[in-house]
């Protein structure tokens, strides 16, 4: 899944 962190994306 991709978590929206600010203006970027972090896969968790």
Curated annotation (Swiss-Prot):
> Which UniProt keywords are present, listed alphabetically?
Neurotoxin, Secreted, Toxin
Give the subcellular location: Secreted
What top-level branch of life does the organism fall under? Eukaryota
The keyword Transmembrane is annotated on this UniProt entry: no
Gene Ontology CC annotation, any one: extracellular region
Q: What is its main location?
A: secreted
Q: In which tissues is it expressed?
A: Expressed by the venom gland.
MF terms (GO), sorted A to Z: toxin activity
Q: What does this protein do?
A: Neurotoxin.
Question: What family name appears in the similarity comment?
Answer: Belongs to the neurotoxin 09 (Tx3-6) family.
Instruction: Write down what this protein is called.
Output: U7-ctenitoxin-Co1a
The organism is: Ctenus ornatus
């Amino acid at each position: 899944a991709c978590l929206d962190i600010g203006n970027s994306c972090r896969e968790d």
